[in-house]
Amino acid sequence: MTRLTHLGSLPLAQDYPPCFDCVVEFADHLGGISLATERVDRRLAAVLAADVAGYSRLMGANEEDTLARLKAVRKILVDPAITSHRGRIVKTTGDGMLVEFASAVDAVRSAIEVQRSMAEQNAAVPQDQRIEFRIGIHVGDVIFDDNDIFGDGVNIAARLEGI
């Protein structure tokens, strides 16, 4: 078997040993991208991660009803609580969401408002049909990229939500 090492003047990844400096050099050959000097936007933020407890079970019992109720709860209770406390919904994932706040106090107040509203909403709903949110909040350094957030601050909030 022959091993190609070059296609014309374009170097192949196999021409470089696996090290960061070599990755930077290879990226420079491909298009002048300098990974070493690319700056990321980091900020301190309060990250709220939330999802619906027992969502798979609820969907298994009645998909259409669960989805309709979740959409209504988000529109009437959750989204307004986030907005009123200056939060920004970064993304939603089916039954979950990731929200960014500039203030930890605002994140906690928003979470308390959601939990209180949901408790009132669920008072007349049978236990096995309740939509209940698990919420985790963490303040930490996050990376902002294309209206999304990444990093340990996000990961820790998501882990806390699962507890």
Region roles according to the model:
Residues 4-12, 30, 35:
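Leucine-biased recognition of intrinsically disordered, low-complexity hydrophobic segments
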Residues 15:
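Acidic, metal-dependent phosphodiester-chemistry machinery of nucleic-acid enzymes
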Residues 19-22:
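Cysteine-centered motifs
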Residues 31-117:
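Catalytic NTP-binding/metal-coordinating core of nucleotidyl cyclase/transferase enzymes
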Residues 37-38, 79, 98-163:
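Catalytic beta-strand-to-alpha-helix segment of the class III nucleotidyl cyclase homology domain
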